[in-house]
């Protein structure tokens, strides 16, 4: 035996090891559809079974950490779709499969196609949030792409009629199930974009099995939704149903009824919001008017406090006080002089100086006359000054000016209107007259050429 022949001699264990490594390296993971037989589950929790078809069979194991993710209990005779790795059990030289996942064969194959298309479109960026279009708020016209005889259309129309009866709806009838359904859905989306009648589209159907909903997992439908210039809301099946169309659409609704609610306004809630806004506006207006009334009351009180009549009344009161004090002072002087005169008379009576008495009487009469003259002159002076002060106050009184036919006009800011530069057309003015106020609005502002001033025209 040559040396090269000796080096190629295998032991059984080496052979089994080499075959195992070759199988695992070359085959890797595969998808296999087959029928289950000889299913068993020992206390360890692992599953052991045989996968077979009508001409061959292979042993398979599914360990506990993998089979706990399976959503069903396998049964003998059941067709399944298995994702598994090929290996060799070295002690006996038996090759077998180690299953990683398992699904019922019918839905499982479709689910595999679903996952493959989902990964492909995601890699192309069709699911990216940056491509999502915002829904119009509010929508002016809604398009519905679904079966004309299906329950989904009835649900959508019922919700739209209840929430927003005035919202126009255009129906693009199409098949939603069967071989021709994907192409019809694509054409309906393209037609809606071509006619550009709607600003949002609802694409969907009612619930069903995975096969029933498969039209919305079609790649052509997904690309038509992605290329639509009109925002699309997907509404396929029930809340638990997920399709490729849901990932591509601008917004996914769990049901057709929910899609109708998303694209419509709730008129009852809208009326409630308007009523709330109206109530807040009325409260704000009441508060504004109350503040204005308080401001007018304060201004009226200040104006009354500065009224010339009040100032004249205060001056008159002061003058009366001075007059009383002067009279009291004069009477006090007279009483003192009278007492002094009486004392002098008593002294004169004792000495009977008739000549002196006569002279003193004359002097007393003269002093009394002078005193009365002085008091009268002083009173006349006070009266004259009081009259002059009253005339001066009347001359500068705003009310006296108003009584002569003039008026005082205030700008919206409350300042006195002196020049046309303070106002413009559309402003509202408040004018004070002799007997009240006038509210007016400026319709035109004209500048006088001679005096280079503006003429204010009010209505």
UniProtKB/Swiss-Prot annotation:
It comes from the Bacteria. GO terms for cellular component: cytoplasm; exodeoxyribonuclease VII complex. Pfam families: Exonuc_VII_L, tRNA_anti_2. It is an enzyme of class 3 (hydrolase). One of its GO terms (biological process) is DNA catabolic process. Its main location: cytoplasm. It catalyses: Exonucleolytic cleavage in either 5'- to 3'- or 3'- to 5'-direction to yield nucleoside 5'-phosphates. Heterooligomer composed of large and small subunits. This is Exodeoxyribonuclease 7 large subunit. The gene is xseA.
